[in-house]
């Protein structure tokens, strides 16, 4: 094995939001002036936690089947005996022993695209918990295939392009039939990174009715959209899902957040057993550059959509050691260092998440899954110094089997300008979008964090992991952290408040979400709660600040890594498009599955401190807060 020398430096950029009011800006389709928040999917999910599930199963005299998929299927049939559905081909058993099975409701052979059912099966083959957003209203009596009075897919494409002001030329579009019922790919278009697609599906609307729609898929770079266009009125777009998650947010060595925390250090062979082919091979080919099984890193100064022929540093002996100083400018003068840093951070995070259970079967990002389940050919495409934007970053997460795509931008908030690849937090934040989107709802469904509140939690998970990874041995529960301070050139960072366990420093409570209308603001509330959770577990189990966790029977032995593990496991347990209450319950269930509930009261205390206690209730307009603990705590 050749030695790999990585001179690593990291940092983390985001939008400059210094005050709470500034976080109320809407999410806008990049540079096209369309408010995407107005098209978000409604929250429809319900979640039955492990305690309630045990009571329900006992009341039903429900018995397990021969395998976990059959048991899960039996539960769905017993819960919705009159509904039709299909098993999604992405079930797997997590490293915590919980089996995850996902179902999609159908009507007349068409998917009801936002009607999902997830069932979690424990080690003994019994139902552990489940969630669903199945449609309970009246299904149309007649199949739309009988009279075929719906519009053709080309009109739907043109309707989406017009309504969302997309840079796609569709005047000469023609629909070509592809595999799948009423599924098409468009030819004769331009402006999208890949051929647009359309599929006829039903959609649950906000008012509880069912609409027949064309699900139109368009990847235009900054946005990768699923637009639900009414199949009878092509000028009406009901909802939009965006696979791209944007940030407003950095490695030296792993754990250093940005250039203020240390100096570049060289590492030899830094990969772990989570990357059996090393970082420079996919098991078939060896690459003398920043390419391997988990990621491919390159510069992208033009902001274009191609990447295979873009520039990457080359080293036959795998020594990637390049100069960088804070005075170097412009960022292109140190692109070798930047690409190397981005490659290092992405791979290092892949290996850490793999140890927690984000592996092949769970839908991680790898070319070669080595016969371990899931779909391969989907490493992370990570672009350094991407010219398609500034002062931001984003990550696109299509379903398992298609590569994720990260775009890291330069920051004009300082002189000389700063490179987002040098702040580890932004890379971690962005990659975490890939983690949460693959786990929530299953690897085959990347549309399960697209409601406003669930999308906010997607941002919050990114902030939480970025912050947890940068903790230092000297830190205590009184330590505060900002987000994006280096990139934004502002010590306060880009969030409304610092992450802190002090209620005066950070006063966010569950009911604060009532006044927030933007995902990053909502995400700050969620990440604040997870920060409380982490410090509660550190106080209970100690804080080991080694780069990698030490496991005993699958359980991390320190509070910091334990928090990261159960938060991640909770993502796989919760329903598609969850709310705060359901995500909290899923984390409590994750601890129950992992430790038999040893940390139940510690977790409850953390959430209760921030108003998400035992009596908290979700309502999209008026959430009810609670500092109450459950009986026994």
From Swiss-Prot:
Residues where Zn(2+) binds: 429, 433
The yes or no answer to whether the keyword Transferase is present is no
Q: Which N-terminal residues, if any, form the signal peptide?
A: 1-18
Instruction: Write out the catalytic residues in the record.
Output: 430
Please give the GO cellular component terms listed in this UniProt entry.
extracellular region
Q: Which domain of life is it from?
A: Eukaryota
Q: Which SUPFAM superfamilies does UniProt cross-reference here?
A: Metalloproteases ('zincins'), catalytic domain
Entry's localization field: Secreted
Entry's cofactor comment: Binds 1 zinc ion per subunit.
Entry's EC annotation: 3.4.24.-
Residues listed as glycosylation sites in the UniProt record: 410, 480
Which residues would be cut away as propeptide? 19-246
- Membrane-spanning segments: none
Q: Name one GO molecular function term.
A: zinc ion binding
Name the Pfam families for this protein.
FTP (PF07504), Peptidase_M36 (PF02128)
Q: Which GO terms describe its biological process?
A: proteolysis
Record keywords, A-Z? Glycoprotein, Hydrolase, Metal-binding, Metalloprotease, Protease, Secreted, Signal, Virulence, Zinc, Zymogen
Q: Which cofactor does it need?
A: Zn(2+)
Family label: Belongs to the peptidase M36 family.
Q: What does this protein do?
A: Secreted metalloproteinase probably acting as a virulence factor.
Query: In its UniProt entry, what is this protein called?
Result: Extracellular metalloproteinase 3
This protein's species is Arthroderma otae (strain ATCC MYA-4605 / CBS 113480)
Q: Give the gene that encodes this protein.
A: MEP3
């Amino acid at each position: 094995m050749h030695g790999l020398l990585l001179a690593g430096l990291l940092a983390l950029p985001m939008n400059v939001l210094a005050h709470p009011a500034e976080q109320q800006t809407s999410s806008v389709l990049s540079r096209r002036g369309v408010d995407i928040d107005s098209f978000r999917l409604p929250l429809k999910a319900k979640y039955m936690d492990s305690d309630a599930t045990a009571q329900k199963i006992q009341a039903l005299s429900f018995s397990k089947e021969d395998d976990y998929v059959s048991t899960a299927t039996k539960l769905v049939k017993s819960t919705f005996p009159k509904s039709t559905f299909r098993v999604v081909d992405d079930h797997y058993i997590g490293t915590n022993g919980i089996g995850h099975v996902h179902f999609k409701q159908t009507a007349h052979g068409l998917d009801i695209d936002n009607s999902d059912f997830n069932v979690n099966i424990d080690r003994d083959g019994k139902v552990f918990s489940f969630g669903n957003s199945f449609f309970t209203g009246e299904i149309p009596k007649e199949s739309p295939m009988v009279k075929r009075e719906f519009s053709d897919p080309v009109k739907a494409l043109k309707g989406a392009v017009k309504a969302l002001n997309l840079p796609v030329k569709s005047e000469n579009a023609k629909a070509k039939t592809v595999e799948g019922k009423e599924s098409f790919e468009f030819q004769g278009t331009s402006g999208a990174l890949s051929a647009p697609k359309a599929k006829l599906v039903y959609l649950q609307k906000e008012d509880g009715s069912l609409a027949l729609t064309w699900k139109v898929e368009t990847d235009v770079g900054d946005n990768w959209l699923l637009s639900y266009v009414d199949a009878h009125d092509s000028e009406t777009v009901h909802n939009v899902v965006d696979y791209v998650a944007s940030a407003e947010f950095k490695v030296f060595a792993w754990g250093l957040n940005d250039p203020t925390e240390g100096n570049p250090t060289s590492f030899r062979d830094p990969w772990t057993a989570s990357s059996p082919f090393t970082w420079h091979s996919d098991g078939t080919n060896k690459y003398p550059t920043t390419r391997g099984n988990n990621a491919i890193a390159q510069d992208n100064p033009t902001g274009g959509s191609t990447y295979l022929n873009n520039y990457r540093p080359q080293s036959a002996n795998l020594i990637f050691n390049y100069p960088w100083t804070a005075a170097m400018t412009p960022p292109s003068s140190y692109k070798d260092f930047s690409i190397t840093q981005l490659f290092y951070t992405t791979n290092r995070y892949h290996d850490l998440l793999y140890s927690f259970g984000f592996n092949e079967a769970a839908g991680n990002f790898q070319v070669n899954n080595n016969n371990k389940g899931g779909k391969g050919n989907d490493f992370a495409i990570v672009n350094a110094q991407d010219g398609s934007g500034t002062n931001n970053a984003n990550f696109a997460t299509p379903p398992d089997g298609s590569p994720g795509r990260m775009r890291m931008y330069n920051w004009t908030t300082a002189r000389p300008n700063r490179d987002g690849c040098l702040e580890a937090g932004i890379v971690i934040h962005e990659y975490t979008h890939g983690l949460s989107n693959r786990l929530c709802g299953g690897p085959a469904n990347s549309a399960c964090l697209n409601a406003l509140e669930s999308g906010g939690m997607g941002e919050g998970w990114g902030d939480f992991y970025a912050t947890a990874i940068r903790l230092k041995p000297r830190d205590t529960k009184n330590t505060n952290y900002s987000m994006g301070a280096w990139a934004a050139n502002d010590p306060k960072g880009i969030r409304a408040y610092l992450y802190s366990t002090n209620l005066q420093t950070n006063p966010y409570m569950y009911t604060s979400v009532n006044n927030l209308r933007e995902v990053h603001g909502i995400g700050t509330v969620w990440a604040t709660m997870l920060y409380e959770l982490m410090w509660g577990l550190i106080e209970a189990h100690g804080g080991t600040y080694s780069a990698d966790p030490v496991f005993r029977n699958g359980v991390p032995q320190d509070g910091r890594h334990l928090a990261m593990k159960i938060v991640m496991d909770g993502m796989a347990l919760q329903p598609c498009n969850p709310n705060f209450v359901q995500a909290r319950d899923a984390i409590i269930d994750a601890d129950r599955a992992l430790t038999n509930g040893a940390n139940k009261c510690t977790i409850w205390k953390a959430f209760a401190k921030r108003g998400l206690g035992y009596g908290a209730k979700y309502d999209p307009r008026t959430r009810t807060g609670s500092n109450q603990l459950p009986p026994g705590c």
